[in-house]
């Protein structure tokens, strides 16, 4: 989650940050992250572009609109089934641009390396970044490298910057959502977070599970070609998961969201791990999925388009915008039962990206 994702522009007035120390939860993408950004960081950097609080900043430039975004990656372990820190860094940055309606143009990367890091590991991650960027047709134009003493970093950290051009047809705005709009999800959730947990050996389970890390731009581009005017909002539900992303959307809104819990696409292994650990899959991070709120008339065509693409077969409608309850996400079961779905609290899975 980038700096801007912490608060919708319609959210409540910012409050002073009163925590006296930084804790792991401040980086988890949930309520603590929001307090840090709203109460400490954003007030110092306040400007009209930042105040829009989108996944990427939009800047008019020569008759076009540019989108810029930055991200940092501290995942542990560095390599895991389905990906690694290098691939994650590229895809995560591309995705922040994509869900802002921007075609990625270029990236930059900064490496913080720990003395003693095996050069073979560094080269592996640089190669992974080159492969992921090449797959997306996006060059990495430059960056920086710093080295810190042994024991002062966990092998390596990666920071990225991305720039893209916003499609002229895009009118993404949380305030544009209306009752009846559909909430679409591109595919199964929870794979990345649970994969990282298993890769650490913290759970005595064996599973054929892989991170979902990928660029979502091809899917977003297909939707823009199909129905750009009918797309109200998009977001990639990384840290904090689907629950946090949807709560950010309706924060301060006159509307709420009904989330159809039985419709959520979740792999059996992920569901089982969440039940075993007492985790809510809606709070688990994803690195290759996105949410889109679309006008009701666009739902069928949008889903058909996504499902026709490799990797989009399980795209589905998981909810709709409603007049009640205001500014809340309400989970609805197949039996008609309901529960309030809040943003992530705490940090159940630290350093997952």
Residue ranges, per PLM feature:
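Helix-biased detector of long, well-ordered alpha-helical tracts
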Residues: 1-353
